[in-house]
From Swiss-Prot:
InterPro entries: ARM-type_fold, eIF-2B_epsilon_N, eIF2B_epsilon, Nucleotide-diphossugar_trans, Trimer_LpxA-like_sf, W2_domain, W2_eIF2B_epsilon. Residues 452-467, 519-533 have a biased composition (Acidic residues). There is a cross-link at residues 57, 99, 137, 213, 501 (Glycyl lysine isopeptide (Lys-Gly) (interchain with G-Cter in ubiquitin)). The gene is Eif2b5. The lineage of its organism: Eukaryota, Metazoa, Chordata, Craniata, Vertebrata. Residues 1-37, 442-479, 517-538 are annotated as: Disordered. This is Translation initiation factor eIF2B subunit epsilon. It comes from the Eukaryota.
Length: 717
């Protein structure tokens, strides 16, 4: 709950701010134009999400090392190079660690041109809370930069700042924010899918007219009014990367205070655009083409940005520059982007192929192959080790014969002999794995038991919340050798059991992918869509289309039954709907399967028991089997249909005893093949609910019957 000392001039800023102050304001009357006030920045040193859990259980995201430099140091170097003279760093999670790091850094040295003031509170839950505190404390006196502490950039912000100030001068403070974006193709590695946006922008003024996140969308809709009466034209932009850098007027903090529903910048942007005609506020865009800016929002972005730093795309923020003035950051740079720190030892026959950073005091054994990797200080690598896109932090030990591919090993993690880490693995601090074990793709191992997270919910933003209790749990709960090896220390994290909407982000892995089975990931959104979820996605065109398509298919089948329409004509109608709503064949198959299974529920008021449900469904399956067979053809289609059937019965638990009869009907009608049913039943990488479903006695008897039938068929052959 600590705060900084009063900021010089803050009281004056509070007195004048409500009058629309800020650079370019109407305060000067007849006097000479004053030079712009010192540039300030608000740096948010918290992400307010758990995307980096369990890594960030040990240290805050802004202190995670990227190319052996803490993320926040890149951000502060960017702000200082931009000309920022005063930066307010707002901390919540692990605030003591951030404060200690900054106080030991050059940023808190008396000679620093950028005065860093640290403000901590356990009450911050969002960007909105931070900006409301900025307003309450009257910290900003003019236009300021708003940025997160995990942004890496070399953008010269001066031009954007001049444009912003000029607009506010000419248009009487109408423009409240200028967002900085970079031109970037949709397929570029540093485009984070979660941050992708499509915008409508005034061609002449760069005023943002429409702003929409595109994650998961296939079609975009724009109000027709955008294109009416715009003499200078409107540009639709999908070639932009969000740098997460915003130039804000002082009114921004006040607007967050006035609108408590604003929690994120996106909330703010949508609110301003929605109320532009009423309040008169506008948001503008500044686009850079050659400079660099990106936010490390997940480990996919961590990997991409780290590679860009090593490949010198963020010059002058390159490893050998040592912009932090640290004695351990003295690197030499050689061909193929090989960086070596002091006192590095490289064994006989070891090859550093390209894009490799070796931290100070690191020892590499003989006959190692290292490429596209970052190794922190004081690491020890044994003989015959392969590192490819590996990110090793401080003090990591890798024993002989290990192979690490596209994975992250945090401080003092240890990999024993002959361990293989497949892509997207994460070992958090002090984890030990091995020997002689292969970690599957996407494995996350931590010394913190996954179930300890439930106990943290009430105090998740406290630096020491639940620490003592968690240590006791570690003592009581042993490690699983099947997961971490005979000498391993750590727990395998899984996210399949997370169901609450508040914790939905925990279903996102550290790498920006989903931690779930392949079948689950391919069918997650194409089935029935919860209306509340639909509302929460702000009218997503893709979800709207799937929902409408599902209703249209239901109507088509109802009409087909009433009017005795042939299956051939039903297929033609469904295909026309498919093209009208731009639905993929996979989505058609999944929606059709669900609609058929749900059809009896739509026709009867009240609950159905399993016997009555089967009595209603089986004649429908027989009648519509040609339609289903038209879409369920390949083995992959069969598995998708089975996943949709599984989802249906997981959602309708009272009908689960009828599942065996339903699958028998699908089998006898030759919609599903016995080998794919057996393959589906034998899947191990499924949810706990899916495993429980497979324990149903009727289902197990049906599977046993199928296996015996398959064996008899094999004997006859």
């Amino acid at each position: 709950m600590a705060a900084t000392a009063a900021v010089p001039g803050a009281a004056a800023g509070r007195a004048s701010k409500r009058g629309g102050g800020g650079s370019g304001g109407g305060g000067t009357q007849g006097a000479e134009e004053e030079p712009p006030p010192p540039l300030q920045a608000v740096l948010v040193a918290d992400s307010f999400n758990r995307r980096f859990f369990p890594i960030s259980k040990d240290q805050p995201r802004v202190l995670l090392p990227l190319a052996n430099v803490a993320l926040i140091d890149y951000t502060l170097e960017f702000l200082t190079a931009t000309g920022v003279q005063e930066t307010f760093v707002f901390c919540c999670w692990k605030a003591a660690q951030i404060k200690e790091h900054l106080q030991k850094s050059k940023w808190c040295h008396p000679t620093s041109p950028n005065v860093v003031r640290i403000i901590t509170s356990e009450l911050y839950r969002s960007l909105g809370d931070v900006l409301r505190d900025v307003d309450a404390k009257a910290l900003v006196r003019s236009d300021f930069l708003l940025i997160y502490g995990d942004v890496i950039s070399n953008i010269n912000i001066c031009r954007a700042l001049e444009e912003h100030r000029l607009r506010r001068k000419l248009e009487k403070n109408v423009s409240v924010m200028t967002m900085v974006f970079k031109e970037s193709s949709p397929s570029h590695p540093t485009r984070c899918h979660e941050d992708n946006v499509v915008m409508a922008v005034d061609s002449a003024t760069n005023r943002v007219l429409h702003f929409q996140k595109t994650q998961g969308l296939r079609r975009f809709s724009f109000p027709l009014s955008l294109f009416q009466g715009s003499g200078d034209g409107v540009e639709i932009r999908y070639d932009l990367l969000d740098c997460h850098i915003s130039i804000c007027s002082p009114q921004v903090a006040q607007l967050f205070t006035d609108n408590f529903d604003y929690q994120t910048r996106d909330d703010f942007v949508r609110g301003i655009l929605m109320n532009e005609e009423v309040l008169g506020n506008q948001i503008h865009l500044h686009v850079t083409t050659r400079e660099y800016g990106a936010r490390v929002s997940n480990l996919h972005m961590y990997s991409a940005v780290c590679a860009d730093v090593i490949r010198r795309w963020v010059y002058p923020l390159t490893p050998e520059v040592n912009f932090t003035d640290s004695t351990t950051q003295s690197y030499t740079h050689s061909r193929h982007n090989i960086y070596r720190g002091p006192e590095v030892s490289l064994g006989h026959g070891s090859v550093l192929e390209e894009n490799v950073l070796l931290g100070a005091g690191t020892v590499i054994g003989s006959n190692c192959s290292i490429t596209n990797s970052v190794i922190g200080p004081n690491c020890h690598i044994g003989d015959n080790v392969v590192l490819d896109q590996a990110y090793l932090w401080q003090g990591v030990r890798v024993a002989a014969g290990a192979q690490i591919h596209q994975s992250l090993l945090c401080d003092r993690a240890e990999v024993k002999e002959r361990v293989k880490l497949k892509p997207y693995c994460v070992l958090t601090s002090q984890v030990v794995v091995g020997p002689d074990i292969t970690l599957p793709e996407g494995s996350v191992i931590s010394l913190h038991p996954p179930d300890a997270e439930e106990d943290e919910d009430d105090g998740q933003f406290s630096d020491d919340s639940g620490a003592d209790q968690e240590k006791e749990k570690v003592k009581l709960k042993g490690y699983n050798p099947a997961e971490v090896g005979l000498e391993g220390q750590g727990y395998l994290w899984k996210a399949e059991g997370v169901n609450s909407k508040e914790d939905e982000e925990l279903r996102q892995s550290l790498w920006g992918l989903m931690i779930k089975t392949e079948e689950e990931s391919e069918t997650e959104s194409e089935g029935s869509v919860d209306p509340e979820e639909l509302d929460s996605r702000a009218g997503s065109p893709q979800l709207d289309d799937i929902r409408v398509f599902q209703n249209e298919v239901l109507g088509t089948l109802q009409r087909g039954r009433e009017e005795n329409i042939s299956c051939e004509n039903l297929v033609l109608e469904i295909n026309s709907l498919k093209h009208a709503y731009n639905i993929s064949l996979k989505e058609v198959m999944q929606v059709l399967t669900l609609v058929v299974l749900e059809f009896p529920l739509q026709q009867v008021d009240g609950l159905l028991d399993p016997n009555r449900y089967c009595a209603l469904l089986l004649p429908l399956l027989k009648a519509w089997s040609p339609v289903l067979r038209n879409y369920i053809k390949r083995a992959a289609d069969h598995l998708e249909a089975l996943a949709a059937i599984e989802d249906f019965f997981l959602e309708h638990e009272t009908l689960v005893t009828s599942m065996a009869k339903v699958l028998m009907a699908f089998y006898q009608l030759e919609i599903l093949a016995e080998e794919t049913i057996l393959s589906w039943f034998s899947q191990r990488d499924t949810t706990d609910e899916g495993q429980q479903l497979r324990k149903n006695q009727q289902l197990q008897r049906f599977i046993q019957w199928l296996r015996e039938a398959e064996e008899e068929s094999s004997e006859d052959d």
